[in-house]
From Swiss-Prot:
Free-text disruption phenotype from the record: Cells lacking this gene are viable only if the medium is supplemented with mevalonate or the cells are complemented with an episomal copy of ispH. A conditional E.coli lytB mutant shows that LytB is essential for survival and that depletion of LytB results in cell lysis.
UniProt binding sites for dimethylallyl diphosphate: 41, 74, 124, 225-227, 269
Effect in UniProt of substituting residue 41 to N: No effect on catalytic activity
One GO location term (cellular component): cytosol
Listed name of the protein: 4-hydroxy-3-methylbut-2-enyl diphosphate reductase
Residue positions binding isopentenyl diphosphate: 41, 74, 124, 225-227, 269
Gene responsible for this protein: ispH
Pfam families: LYTB (PF02401)
Effect of residue 124 to N: Loss of catalytic activity
Residues that bind (2E)-4-hydroxy-3-methylbut-2-enyl diphosphate: 41, 74, 124, 167, 225-227, 269
Cofactor remark from the record: Was shown to bind 1 [3Fe-4S] cluster per subunit. However, it initially contains a [4Fe-4S] cluster which easily degrades into a [3Fe-4S] form in the presence of oxygen.
Functional description taken from the UniProt entry: Catalyzes the conversion of 1-hydroxy-2-methyl-2-(E)-butenyl 4-diphosphate (HMBPP) into a mixture of isopentenyl diphosphate (IPP) and dimethylallyl diphosphate (DMAPP). Acts in the terminal step of the DOXP/MEP pathway for isoprenoid precursor biosynthesis. In vitro, can also hydrate acetylenes to aldehydes and ketones via anti-Markovnikov/Markovnikov addition.
Root EC class: oxidoreductase
Length: 316
């Protein structure tokens, strides 16, 4: 059985930065460090940080005075940010800079009183944070997930309208929603390029190439990871059996029985150790050496806040 590895796969710059912020805060300040929401959507990462003293909470009221608080990579609303400011807390922001860019687009529209439409998944923390940047009662902020939502939507002023997107969406699905928005509201204004981030786009492109060759595709990622779910859906849409797995223990032998080629990829919040474990398990089931496919090279790095720029090896 041939094993193919998608390229790129796994950690993106925003996830790397967010995890480093929590790790460095633990090294400098010691446990406990409070993190609002899972810093990234990966069970292995969250469990390992929890073991080292990170406490994951959903409400600022759960954080004691004088504590260290970190906002997750998904970003937070202005209301959450203001609540944290009103408390005696030291706050570090692990929001992905590409999410912050979308926040700034929404804030600009809010200041101008223009209505805004966000393409995204209801209930996702990134969507909640992005919607929470809009505060102008003269305008309005709306969420759509599908072309059907667009056709049902009514706004106050079609002449002054803009749209933004969640950063971890399906490129193909989002294109369909944008097409519907432009037909429904001909004067709507959007970003020069949709807000789907480079890592999401690259990983979807890579899984498309992977699924062209593999009979079965394994996506390493947690069930609550938006970008990981989109990878599995894309492979399935291409007619391949695809499974979203947290780790090697989730692999069922019958998935790869009599399969000649299996493909492996990982969502942007899944560490490479999990991919290595999956490859090792596939090799136990008869797989050969893992062969990486060619793909886009990624060299983007996002710096951590200057207060946390320390070599953690220097910290006792």
């Amino acid at each position: 059985m041939q094993i193919l590895l998608a390229n790129p796969r796994g950690f993106c710059a925003g996830v790397d930065r967010a995890i480093s912020i929590v790790e460095n805060a633990l090294a400098i300040y010691g446990a406990p460090i409070y993190v609002r929401h899972e810093v990234v959507h990966n069970r292995y990462v969250v469990d390992s940080l929890r073991e080292r003293g990170a406490i994951f909470i959903e409400q600022i009221s759960e954080v004691p005075d004088g504590a260290i608080l970190i906002f997750s990579a998904h970003g937070v609303s202005q209301a959450v940010r203001n609540e944290a400011k009103s408390r005696d807390l030291t706050v570090f922001d692990a929001t992905c800079p590409l999410v912050t860019k979308v926040h700034m687009e929404v804030a600009r529209a809010s200041r101008r009183g223009e209505e805004s439409i966000l393409i995204g998944h209801a209930g996702h923390p990134e969507v909640e944070g992005t919607m929470g940047q809009y505060s102008n009662p003269e305008g309005g902020m709306y969420l759509v997930e599908s072309p059907d939502d667009v056709w049902k939507l009514t706004v106050k002023n079609e002449e002054k309208l803009s749209f933004m997107t969640q950063t971890t969406l399906s490129v193909d699905d989002t294109s369909d929603v944008i097409d519907a928005l432009r037909k429904r509201f001909p004067k709507i204004v959007g970003p020069r390029k949709d807000d789907i981030c480079y890592a999401t786009t690259n990983r979807q492109e890579a899984v498309r190439a992977l699924a062209e060759q593999a009979e079965v595709v394994l996506v390493v990622g947690s069930k609550n990871s938006s970008n990981s779910n989109r990878l599995a859906e894309l492979a399935q849409r291409m007619g391949k059996r695809a499974f979203l797995i947290d780790d090697a223990k989730d692999i069922q032998e019958e998935w790869v029985k009599e399969v000649k080629c299996v493909g492996v990829t990982a969502g942007a919040s899944a560490p490479d150790i999990l991919v290595q474990n999956v490859v090792a398990r596939l090799q136990q089931l008869g797989g050969g050496e893992a062969i990486p496919l060619e793909g886009r090279e990624e060299n983007i790095v996002f710096e951590v806040p200057k207060e946390l720029r320390v070599d953690i090896r220097e910290v006792d």
